[in-house]
């Protein structure tokens, strides 16, 4: 398995796996399938091009012949928040879970974060129904620091998200 930062050339692969994530696990993401579909592959390619051009943001992909997992990394840009970054959009399809793909993606994002001067912490949120993802985050040192009740609403059903953080200064 190879984990690397995605480029514009990976737009179609990212597009397909992200659409699958939003279709198969809609409660785990803030975006909807329809919202992402509207962006189109051209919008995805532009986003990946922008991310690879900005040294602090990256989208990671795990490949085992084809793409088998994704996660995003975005550093806060405001001066008072520039010491923080966020993990977003992490997804590994059900049939690929349990093979260490999510762990490899997160380890790549954490290693990347440690190369960025002044970055002190990485935050993420995880929907409480994603027990395996939560356990993975804890195993890599993320610590819970809060709970956002009713963080997401899908078809009149609410989903709570646990807020977690990894201290890079330790």
Regions found by a protein language model. Name each.
Residues 66-69, 132, 158:
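Glycine-rich acetyl-CoA-binding "A-motif" of GNAT/NAT acetyltransferases
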């Amino acid at each position: 398995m190879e984990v690397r930062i995605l480029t514009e050339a990976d737009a179609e692969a990212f597009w397909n796996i992200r659409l699958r994530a939003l279709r198969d696990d809609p409660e785990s993401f803030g975006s909807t399938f329809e919202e992402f579909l509207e962006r189109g592959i051209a919008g995805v390619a532009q986003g990946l091009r922008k991310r690879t051009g900005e040294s602090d943001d990256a989208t990671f992909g795990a490949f085992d012949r084809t793409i088998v997992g994704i996660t995003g990394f975005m550093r806060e840009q405001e001066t008072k928040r520039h010491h923080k970054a966020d993990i977003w959009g992490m997804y590994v399809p059900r049939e690929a879970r349990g093979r260490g793909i999510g762990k490899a993606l997160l380890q790549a994002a954490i290693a990347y974060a440690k190369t960025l001067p002044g970055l002190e912490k990485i935050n993420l949120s995880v929907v409480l129904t994603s027990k395996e993802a939560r356990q993975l985050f804890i195993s890599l040192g993320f610590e819970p620091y809060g709970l956002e009740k009713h963080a997401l609403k899908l078809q009149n059903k609410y989903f709570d998200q646990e807020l977690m953080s990894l201290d890079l200064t330790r």
